[in-house]
A protein has these predicted regions:
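N-terminal membrane-proximal hinge/A-helix region immediately C-terminal to the signal-anchor transmembrane segment
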Residues: 2-95, 99-108, 123, 127-135, ...
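Conserved cytochrome P450 K-helix/beta-meander segment immediately N-terminal to the heme-binding cysteine loop
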Residues: 355-383
Length: 543
């Protein structure tokens, strides 16, 4: 683990090297704004794993690579503050909500939403997502063309709102909610990081949409209060939630947290789903391999279920490779509240530090031939992502995206259903499809057109691969040890579903290991818990 120290300086205590070429007043903003990724890659190639640049008056320090990422993600909030860095979201989430709330209040708010992302409800989301995809393609016919990104944006609004927000947003407020969400989404752009309240049309529409959504939320709360039965969704969770002092959430707070929920479930997933099909369409050999995996798993009439979605190693590796090359968030930011030390360098309080998944994912020493699309990087034979904090598409540490399991479930379900029915081809040259860096969340440049064709052949005799001969041999020994990284554990309770004899998670998300030295007959269950833990907080050690 990389050593950081928020109190004592290192022996050298020198400032990070600075990027040359800063212009008066605007610093490096012009070059950064043209293409943030190219600029950050240039900084890494020029200065190494840590270096400083300037955006207007803000001094930023970029840290990349596994060691730098670990220092960044494991730093305490008192030293590197996530909330102070994301004031850009205050106009959207609202005053006093999530990033604008004091640390203790923010932690309470985030904990209120955790139950909808736990393992038990997750098992029901698979069928909802499958049904939504099937409904979207019901009238496609044998062939046609679509704007893939726009299709995925519409689809993931439906899947996310249906799974997480409730029926009112999915069915009753469909068109108006989609318009409101679009205006909120457009309000998140790089300019808002520096000047979030400029009197620009895009920001005026953002604020108007936020106010209208709060009106809608207030109305739904009143209607739900008249119903004897309660819904089981994030909305109802927030209506019923209480702070530690017993007070309820206000409609203003509920609105902001619902926006945060849908942003997490939709904002990044649409682009990743589109890129997954684009990358497969670029490479027929990879497309065929994924189709073969799906045919073996489902045959002609097999049902896409929660369990089957967990057993798609090839498709999962394809998605991981897409997220390596096209992470939706190209940089993550923290404000330095106390001097931050990394190796021989000290970043003074008041500056900002950031890390870039996109840059870290292109370090050749970690990922050879980094620009090559190669899903086999993640196979057991290679494990190029084995080094901690090398693959950080979902962040890391205690602030790792709590919805990462939902995101992977949603992505695999969407791609699996689509590819069981259709194949996809590019309508334009391969290099036409590029990332759009004009928004804070990176997606393919629009329009993003593809051609679909109904699959004509599928092996009717394809069956799920036999497990014969693949079962793990029981190791020799007397017991094994379970190690929990408490900083990574977020209380998803997947481990409790897989091995209730070994793990217990309470309503607040606190994990208890029930047996310190379990017998070997529980090893396979423990390994399942380790395998499916969304945050990789569990490690099994044989004695």
């Amino acid at each position: 683990m990389t050593t950081i120290n928020s109190e004592k300086p290192t022996s050298s205590d020198k400032a990070p090297p600075k990027m040359p070429g800063a212009l008066p007043l605007i610093g490096h903003m012009l070059e950064f704004g043209k293409n943030p990724f190219n600029y950050m890659m240039k900084l890494r190639n020029t200065l190494g794993e840590i270096g400083e640049f300037r955006m207007f008056h803000q001094r930023m320090v970029l840290m990349t690579g596994p060691e730098a990422n670990e220092a960044f993600f494991r730093a305490p909030d008192t030293q590197l503050d996530q909330s102070q860095a994301y004031k850009i979201m205050t106009p959207i989430f609202g005053k006093g909500v999530v990033f604008d709330a004091p640390p203790d209040k923010k932690d309470q708010q985030l904990k209120m939403l955790m139950p909808v992302l736990r393992d038990k409800p997750m098992r029901g989301y698979a069928q909802i997502i499958v049904a939504e995809v099937e409904q979207m393609v019901a009238d496609w016919g044998d062939s046609g063309e679509i704007d893939l990104l726009e299709f995925m944006k519409e689809l993931t609004i439906y899947t996310s709102s249906h799974c997480l927000l409730g029926n009112e947003f999915r069915y009753e407020l469909n068109e108006e909610f989609a318009k409101i969400y679009h205006d909120l989404e457009k309000g998140v752009n790089p300019l808002a990081f520096v000047f979030p309240y400029l009197p620009l049309p895009v920001f005026r529409r953002r604020d108007k949409a936020r106010a209208r959504l709060q009106e809608m939320v207030t109305g739904i709360i009143a209607k739900r209060a008249q119903k004897p039965e309660k819904s089981e969704d994030a909305f109802q969770l927030l209506i019923d939630a209480r702070y530690d002092d017993g007070s309820r959430l206000s409609p203003h707070e509920i609105t902001g947290m619902l926006i945060g929920t849908i942003f997490a479930g939709h904002h990044t997933t649409a682009g990743t789903a589109a890129w997954t099909l684009l990358e497969l369409a670029r490479r027929p050999e990879h497309m065929q391999a994924v189709l073969s995996e799906l045919d073996r798993l489902f045959g002609a009439d097999g049902e896409v279920t929660f369990q089957s979605l967990r057993e798609m190693p090839l498709l999962e590796n394809v998605i991981k490779e897409v997220l390596r090359l096209h992470p939706p968030l190209i940089f993550l930011i923290r404000k330095v509240m106390q001097d931050f030390h990394f190796k021989d360098y000290t970043v003074k309080a008041g500056k900002y530090v950031c890390t870039s998944p996109r840059v870290s994912h292109r370090i050749e020493e970690i990922f050879p031939e980094p620009e090559k699309f190669d899903p086999e990087r993640y196979t057991e034979a290679r494990q190029e992502d084995a080094k901690p904090f090398s693959w950080i598409a979902f962040g890391g540490g205690k602030h790792k995206c709590t919805g990462n399991a939902f995101a992977m479930l949603q992505l695999k379900a969407i791609i699996a259903v689509l590819l069981r029915r259709y194949t996809f081809e590019l309508t334009d040259a391969k290099d036409h499809y590029q990332d759009d860096f004009t928004q804070m969340v990176v997606q393919p440049v629009s329009p993003c057109r593809v051609r679909y064709r109904k699959r004509q052949t599928m092996s009717d005799t394809a069956t799920q691969a036999s497990e014969a001969g693949t079962a793990e041999k029981t190791p020799t020994g007397e017991s094994f040890r379970i190690v929990i990284d408490r900083e990574l554990c977020q209380g998803h309770a997947t481990c409790m579903s897989e091995a209730p004899e070994l793990f217990q998670v309470d309503d607040d998300g606190n994990l208890t290991v029930l047996q310190e030295n379990p017998a070997l007959d529980l090893l396979n269950k423990a390994k399942q818990a380790e395998k499916y833990c969304p945050t990789q907080a569990i490690k099994i050690q044989l004695k």
